[in-house]
Curated annotation (Swiss-Prot):
This is the non-catalytic component of the active enzyme, which catalyzes the hydrolysis of ATP coupled with the exchange of Na(+) and K(+) ions across the plasma membrane. The exact function of the beta-2 subunit is not known. Mediates cell adhesion of neurons and astrocytes, and promotes neurite outgrowth. Glycans are attached at residues 96, 118, 153, 159, 193, 197, 238. Residues 1-39 are cytoplasmic. Keywords: Cell adhesion, Cell membrane, Disulfide bond, Glycoprotein, Ion transport, Membrane, Potassium, Potassium transport, Signal-anchor, Sodium, Sodium transport, Sodium/potassium transport, Transmembrane, Transmembrane helix, Transport. One of its GO terms (molecular function) is protein-macromolecule adaptor activity. It is found in: Cell membrane. It is a single-pass type II membrane protein. NCBIfam families: Na_K_ATPase_bet (TIGR01107). InterPro entries: Na/K_ATPase_sub_beta (IPR000402), Na/K_ATPase_sub_beta_sf (IPR038702). This is Sodium/potassium-transporting ATPase subunit beta-2. Disulfide bonds join 129-150, 160-177, 200-261.
Amino acid sequence: MVIQKEKKSCGQVVEEWKEFVWNPRTHQFMGRTGTSWAFILLFYLVFYGFLTAMFTLTMWVMLQTVSEHTPKYQDRLATPGLMIRPKTENLDVIVNVSDTESWDQHVQKLNKFLEPYNDSIQAQKNDVCRPGRYYEQPDNGVLNYPKRACQFNRTQLGNCSGIGDPTHYGYSTGQPCVFIKMNRVINFYAGANQSMNVTCAGKRDEDAENLGNFVMFPANGNIDLMYFPYYGKKFHVNYTQPLVAVKFLNVTPNVEVNVECRINAANIATDDERDKFAGRVAFKLRINKT
């Protein structure tokens, strides 16, 4: 014979919950006395306090082994990569000459990007250095901080400087300037005491034909040794990366051209197929004209 359990009324359930929360007979709150709750809270306070202290101690010990100026491990950044400006999502530089809005965003980005290179700012913050040699600033047992940086003046970019330029870096006339910059790598040396230079070309034969002529600023795409080595963001507070500007003069209109630019230096490998940005950068250039 099945014995049916008597169903509690709503009032009984409420009373049981009220008694669980606070039992006036035993003076228990949610099943525990005040003393029991005090011991529980004290235990967790000590437990989590100990964990926090252990975490803080281990972090402090670890930070004593790390320099705040130079990363401890840099082997993954042995070869600097190249990037272009104006910065676009897919490295596509598309210009519709007759459509101002299509290239005005590029012009605004370049204005902002080149602002730190203004000659007046460079003269105020950085040094005039001797070209053709590394600008080394060793500590010699005493922290040499901050490091000084060499001037890279905007006027060195010639017709791509954008100074008093009614063509807006050439974008309004279909002769755009694209800027090549080398990513910063701490304590990087070009090797063989020879200046580096950037070269650009079409990736395929048809790209080379459609690319046409171009000029580089500084001349021959040179990057002088005096801008190296780089000592890090905290050491080299006012460091400005050297740039190479490429002005494309007569790209075949309405055709997508694949361009690849490489940095040429004694110890930079540009043929690593696993890293498409090691010492090189590829981008697409299209000049639309109606």
